[in-house]
């Protein structure tokens, strides 16, 4: 995956690095790399998503009280 950042003439290095970091974060490259380090079965992935949703719902109910 390529991340292309255009640099305008006279633009500061700090600004360019900030742009690069934002593009890097938006592309979610780190997240993809971490996910691909080990294989997770689809059923386990689904179970994890459901557990997170259940936890969020529980927290929402506690906040309403």
UniProtKB/Swiss-Prot annotation:
Q: Which InterPro entries match?
A: Ribosomal_bS21, Ribosomal_bS21_sf
| A GO-annotated cellular component | ribonucleoprotein complex
Q: What UniProt keywords apply to this chain's record, in alphabetical order?
A: Ribonucleoprotein, Ribosomal protein
Q: Does the keyword Kinase apply?
A: no
Give the Gene Ontology MF terms in alphabetical order.
structural constituent of ribosome
Q: Name one Pfam family in it.
A: Ribosomal_S21
Supply one GO BP term: translation
Q: Could you confirm whether the keyword Ribosomal protein appears in this record?
A: yes
According to its UniProt record, which protein family does this protein belong to?
Belongs to the bacterial ribosomal protein bS21 family.
Name the record gives this protein: Small ribosomal subunit protein bS21
Q: Which source organism does the UniProt entry give?
A: Aster yellows phytoplasma
Provide the organism lineage as a comma list. Bacteria, Bacillati, Mycoplasmatota, Mollicutes, Acholeplasmatales
Name of encoding gene: rpsU
